């Protein structure tokens, strides 16, 4: 009798499991059909929006910005569909076993969550952001009545010893701010309104959470970054200030923002007798980059054939990379001049491009993206630094051994300073945006300069009360994005360590970069090809053997 009861129980359990598996299979079939229907709608809209943005930034024409706004709104309206969001919520809580299916649902859930607001508010946000961005991109500051480009301003700040001209150039870089401040602030309020309607404290918190980042963890990382870099930066900035004050024949305490090499002090000022521009000025930096990437098995010729490489009136004055269709149409928008900065920028943007181009196209559409925004920034930064790598420069620029030796010490110093300077600048941006969305009614002009003085240790200009914060395009066009650049720096350092181990060398400086297809293969296999198949944190462990850490960034300073 006991055996009979036991057999009945086992039969019951088997039937239950079969029924459960059948239900899961039915749910998975329903989920796949739902995702297929979303793909059919979202895929062409994404492509249309990307193409419109490309044409807008290439030409500066209002008609393309309007087309971009329309396509973006149409796309946002799809994500705002409440019935579809409810389906995603149900599917997310179901026990789907297929990992690719479950991952797509997770990604779509957060994408829809961020848009669950009424269409009127959605329309306001989309149209205002596009209008402000168009104004920003077409604006050119003036020096003594003459319109100047961003490149013109940078050249003055890098090379001129005329203090009056330097100040005028710096002020020209800020002239866009009053033209966009009012609408940018209105945009902040609209973004916060949307976030609060969804149950978040503010837009910054919502942006992190819906992008699979923990606000508490991000805050912890940036506090640690501040503590780890504060004294090294203070020491090195005193050295830089001593050199700059002698160059300009003023006291160190008289240095102001226009005495540095970039309008925001993002870049290393000219504190070395070595000027790397001399090695690039008679070269073609685009061809150098093309040759380099081909040598590591990550060809970029198709990317460059579709790209927009040189500056002209009305064109977007900065740089970006875009994946138009997730099917191979990847492009970069740059404004190249043959100098070290643009060598770095072209390497950076093509770093994004080789990532996007080498994602496995057999993956479902919604997984054909980078694992995270900061993982593609990490790759871009990993390659960007090669413009200051003496071994790489010798190979790519045909320098002789003596020339390589001449720049080795200077480039090592530049790379250290670059890391420190950017870390402190990223602290300004992270803390400004965090505070901006927490309290947009505060005195933002004062907040901006308080943070610049605290983290970058630059004195604010006397008697200046201008919305200088609004001259940074990221606040409008790429909100709550800047922290990803610094997280990318941390991952780039961790990746350098992992690749050194992979190549069997004990120092990242000994990594073989040039004509090494094995390097490209490592990146394709471990990072690029998997796309967004895994969450960013799982991908990093798989690729490097450990969780994201600031350890290697600090060690490599």
Task: Set out the residue ranges of the language-model regions.
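Post-HExxH zinc-binding segment in Zn-dependent metallohydrolases
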Residues: 222-232, 359, 370-404, 495
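C-terminal, non-catalytic "cap/extension" segments appended to globular domains
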Residues: 21-30, 57, 62, 107, ...
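Short alpha-helical catalytic segment bearing the HExxH-like zincin motif
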Residues: 338-349
